[in-house]
Amino acid sequence: MAAEQFDDFDSFPNLVTMFFVRARYRGDAPFLWAKHDGAWQSLSWAEVARQVAGFAKSLRQLGLEKGDRVMLVSENRPEWCIADLGIMAAGCVTVPTYVTNTERDHQHILDDSAARAVIVSTAKLAKTLMPAALRSSQAEFIIAMEPQPAVQHGQLSMHQWSDMVQGNDADVRAAEAAMAAVTRDDLACIIYTSGTGGAPRGVMQHHGAILHNVDGAAEVLREDFGLDEEEVFLSFLPLSHA
């Protein structure tokens, strides 16, 4: 597939289809990087696609359905991107939150979004999240990216990230086929404000609107800066803000 075909963002029905098409084209090329023990390590496009598909499959096996909200509490890391894409690949809606949120902020967002599942990265972030999740009338599942200390989890069902991202090429094909039911008018995510002016407010973003932004950003990077697909970008601003 020619790289030029990726300039036509209007042809994609949703963000996940765009990703899977891109992953097929890029294959084993590095996609996401993170530093571990002082050394940079990468995940390829193909491996990320398998993890995204595996995570989507696991969410559906938990009983999550199209339109269900999944809250994401994590610092910038490759798992953040995989979680976001996997949530949308399951037909669900990502609810990203700031790592600086207070317990009260988490409580408000959980109640306002009616999130059925919550993904949390570290034990430190879980300290402010768990009390709010335990009080939530809608939350059912906690998915931990890293091992968590033994804490009271009440009615919440606890799951480990590593168990939920086991996917293969067949899962990728199934996930891509399932995305035919998701259109540009479907909700992709609900981004909450920081709450500095009161309670955080959710802004609904649909697949089509984000694809339009992707199209505009790609044009600027390509025409104004002369960047191509081999460029490496450092993620500095919180992904939850984007």
Q: Model segments located where?
A:
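Short hydrophobic alpha-helices that are characteristic scaffold elements of the AMP-binding
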Residues: L85-V93, D112, H241
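AMP-dependent adenylate-forming
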Residues: M18-L43, A150
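Conserved structural elements of the adenylate-forming
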Residues: A49-G54, R184, V203-F225
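Conserved AMP-binding/adenylate-forming core of the ANL superfamily
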Residues: F31-L85, T102-Q107, Q160-V165, H207-G208
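Conserved ATP-dependent adenylate/AMP-binding module captured primarily in the ANL superfamily
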Residues: V99-P131, N213-L234
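ANL superfamily adenylate-forming
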Residues: A126-R184
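Conserved pre-ATP/AMP-binding loop-to-beta segment of ANL
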Residues: G27-P30, A144, H159, D169-Y192, ...
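Conserved AMP-binding A3 loop
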Residues: S42-A46, A188-V214
